[in-house]
Design a protein with these regions (language model features):
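Short S/T/G/P-rich N-terminal loop/turn motif that feeds into the first structured element of a domain
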Residues: 1-58, 66-76, 99-103
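Long, highly charged amphipathic alpha-helices
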Residues: 23-26, 82-86
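A common structural junction motif
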Residues: 32-36, 79-85, 91
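Charge-dense polyanion-binding interfaces
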Residues: 86-103
Length: 103
């Protein structure tokens, strides 16, 4: 199955304090109602062990959008802004974002 016309937004989060994991999960769950998002996956590193796998992050967020414009709308959505300010910035030591589009 090919994900045609898809903008992929993949975010990895490294917590300052591991004890804040459930709090960050609650924050990520606040993003679910954002209408610009087509699909959402909140996850943790899989139990896989290969040299090319980075399992150092604490949580990941994978979002699928129908277009770059939908992703831009997500960035400006007040729910996303509140998540970034209230959860990601205070709780995370590092955040890495990888965006991709179809070839």
């Amino acid at each position: 199955m090919s994900l045609n016309n898809t903008f992929v937004h993949h975010v990895h989060f490294w917590l300052k304090n591991k004890e804040d994991k459930s709090r960050l999960i609650r924050g990520l769950e606040t993003l679910i109602p954002i209408t610009h998002i087509r699909d959402i996956h909140i996850g943790v590193p899989a139990d896989t062990d290969r040299d090319v796998i980075d399992r150092s992050y604490d949580l990941s967020l994978l979002l699928l959008f129908d277009s770059p414009e939908a992703q831009a709308g997500y960035q400006d959505d007040p729910i996303h802004v509140a998540f970034a300010e209230g959860y990601a910035k205070p709780l995370c030591a590092k955040v890495v974002v990888q965006d991709s589009v179809n070839i």
